Structures are given as structure tokens and as C-alpha cells.
């Protein structure tokens, strides 16, 4: 293992502008931001075992982890700083804060993100498909939605009652499947986005009431209705394209 592991770090560059304007006798705020983040020295775990000739990949092949070539003392896993990511995001936000005079507030935020990573890991540190990160190239970041829209609103219904709602919409997130259709020794990591254009959607509603006890003490009761329309957000896809002459029908 690497006995001189580094602390992972990120460099972030941001540029934004915020404005206030009047619309419908109300004060609104708009935000536009561009953010670029590069992360370095993430912790990775890769296989240290090699074939009898010292190679990681099979002769003439571009794929094939040497799992069956354990030395007499067992399997070797190497811990290093090879994980890197980079992402560029655009944030558009429109906000009308709640005020006692208007009795309502609203917020709308849209985020576009272009993310890349140099491993096939999904929140973990494993890098077992290749001998090092240089073989992966830049793959779409897993778990990051390219498009995300969040809308929220609150309204004072009177008599101490407050009603609110929140809507979240996300595009389908990338997954990195294994494609061995070209041969068992020439598999590739083949990114794809499952399902339709919307990968996640949820609408939540809430109602609350505040009670004044006539002293310095107040208490509030709140009821939440989560995922109002019982939308199904699927997960756990089959990330296997198939092998030579045997494509995955799914």
C-alpha cells in the first residue's frame, strides 16, 4: 500500500450575480451562478495481483481482472490517491421571500450539471477493472443528475394555518454498464441513462398551525403528505449488456 496517502481536496471556481426587482408589488430576487469544481487525490482500492508474466490484463486483451492469480500469501489490494472528479454547474434561482404583508413566498431553482469521474466507482473506492485510473478515461459521474428542478411555496391561510408544497424533478442519472459483446477479453465500460427523461419526481404537501398560549411559549402542529401522487422512482438497474453472442434482452 501507499504509506504516504494524501488528504483529498477540491478546487472550486464560482462566478455569480444576484439581483432584486419588483414584480406585482412584490420584491423578487434572482440568482445566476456558474461553478466549476475539480477534486483530486480521492482514495481508491485496486488489485495488486498480477499474472505469472507480471501483466494485469490477459495477453492481447483489454479486459480481465486477474482474480485467479493469488500469490501464496493471499490477495493484494492497493490503496492509493487516484480518484478524480470534475463538474461544471449552472444554477438559476428565483426567490420571493415570505413576508407577513404578502402572506406567501415562493422559490424556484434549476441546476444543470456536467460531471465526470475517472473510475467506475459508485460512491465507493473500488477500481478493480483495470490496473490503474489511467485506463478508464473520463466517465459520466454516477449519481449526479444533469438537470434538477426544485420548486417550493408557502401560504398563510389565516387562523394560524400555514400551507406549503415542494416539487422535485430530476433527469435520469448516468450508470456505467459492462459491455462484453465484443469478447470476454475486450469488455468495455459503457455508460447509459436508464428509463425516460425524468428519473426522479416527488411532490410533498404540508399543513401546519401555530398555537399562542398567551405567554412566551408557542407550539406548532404539522402534518405532511409525502409523495402525493405515489410516483415510483426506480433504482437497481441491470448494468450488463451481455457477452459474445448472448446480448442481454433487458
Roles of regions detected by a PLM:
Residues 11, 28, 35, 236-237, ...:
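Extracytoplasmic low-complexity repetitive segments enriched in small/polar residues
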Residues 11-15, 88-92, 147-153, 201-207, ...:
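Hydrophobic, lipid-facing positions within transmembrane beta-strands of outer-membrane proteins
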Residues 20-22, 99-100, 212-214:
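Short polar/acidic secondary-structure junctions
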Residues 5, 82, 137-141, 191-198:
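Short, contiguous acidic/charged loop-to-helix segments that flank catalytic cores in large enzymes
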Residues 41, 45, 158-185, 197-202, ...:
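C-terminal beta-signal and adjacent terminal beta-strands/loops
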Residues 29-177:
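Gram-negative outer-membrane beta-barrel transporters
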Residues 1-23, 75-89:
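Outer-membrane beta-barrel signature, preferentially recognizing the C-terminal barrel domain
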Amino acid at each position: 500500500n501507499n504509506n504516504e496517502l494524501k488528504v483529498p481536496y477540491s478546487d472550486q471556481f464560482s462566478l455569480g450575480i444576484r439581483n432584486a426587482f419588483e414584480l406585482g408589488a412584490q420584491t423578487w430576487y434572482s440568482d445566476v451562478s456558474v461553478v466549476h469544481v475539480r477534486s483530486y487525490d480521492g482514495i481508491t482500492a485496486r488489485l495488486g495481483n498480477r499474472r505469472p508474466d507480471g501483466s494485469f490484463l490477459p495477453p492481447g486483451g483489454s479486459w480481465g481482472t486477474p482474480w485467479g492469480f493469488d500469490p501464496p500469501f493471499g490477495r493484494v489490494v492497493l490503496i492509493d490517491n487516484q480518484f478524480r472528479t470534475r463538474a461544471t454547474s449552472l444554477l438559476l434561482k428565483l426567490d420571493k421571500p415570505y413576508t407577513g404583508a404578502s402572506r406567501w413566498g415562493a422559490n424556484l431553482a434549476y441546476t444543470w450539471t456536467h460531471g465526470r469521474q475517472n473510475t467506475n466507482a459508485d460512491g465507493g473506492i473500488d477500481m478493480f477493472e483495470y490496473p490503474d485510473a489511467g485506463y478508464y478515461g473520463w466517465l459520466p459521474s454516477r449519481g449526479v443528475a444533469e438537470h434538477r428542478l426544485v420548486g417550493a411555496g408557502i401560504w398563510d391561510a389565516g387562523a394560524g394555518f400555514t400551507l406549503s408544497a415542494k416539487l422535485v424533478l430530476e433527469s435520469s442519472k448516468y450508470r456505467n454498464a459492462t459491455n462484453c459483446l465484443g469478447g470476454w477479453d475486450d469488455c468495455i465500460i459503457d455508460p447509459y441513462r436508464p428509463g425516460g427523461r425524468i428519473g426522479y419526481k416527488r411532490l410533498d404537501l404540508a399543513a401546519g398551525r401555530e398555537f399562542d398560549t398567551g405567554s412566551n411559549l408557542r407550539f406548532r402542529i404539522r402534518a405532511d403528505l409525502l409523495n402525493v401522487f405515489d410516483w415510483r422512482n426506480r433504482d437497481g438497474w441491470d448494468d450488463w449488456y451481455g457477452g459474445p453472442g448472448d446480448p442481454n434482452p433487458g
